[in-house]
Amino acid sequence: MAMPNFGDMMKQLQEAGAKMQDVQKQLEKLVSEGEAGGGMVKAKVNGRQKLLELSIDPEIMDDVDMVQDLVVAAVNKALDASAQLAQNEIQKAAGGMINPADLLKQFGGQG
């Protein structure tokens, strides 16, 4: 039985780590948007699951309950889109070697 080449394994791990760092930088630049109430509330998040922008139509500000519901819905839609985008980017970079859901959890995503 041949012994595994640990030098090659370490090199592959280092390369994978470098790829993942590149992916994390890319994810910060990718933006996903979610909206609710026919566009009355819009949320933008990046691929690292950080809320970047929230806009609310001033005409709905009188109805606090509706605004709260729409904000939650818009942010959740944006986060879902962002998580899918991040998973796709990680899969591309990993070439199928890493489970993207596990990696997202390590970097604070929903996974």
Curated annotation (Swiss-Prot):
Q: Does the keyword DNA-binding apply?
A: yes
Q: Where in the cell is it found?
A: Cytoplasm, Nucleoid
> What UniProt keywords are attached to this protein's entry?
Cytoplasm, DNA-binding
- What are the disulfide bonds? none
Query: Which Gene Ontology cellular component terms are annotated?
Result: bacterial nucleoid; cytosol
Q: How does it assemble?
A: Homodimer.
HAMAP family given in the database record: DNA_YbaB_EbfC
This chain's function reads: Binds to DNA and alters its conformation. May be involved in regulation of gene expression, nucleoid organization and DNA protection.
| NCBIfam families, per database record | DNA_YbaB_EbfC
Name of protein: Nucleoid-associated protein Cpar_0834
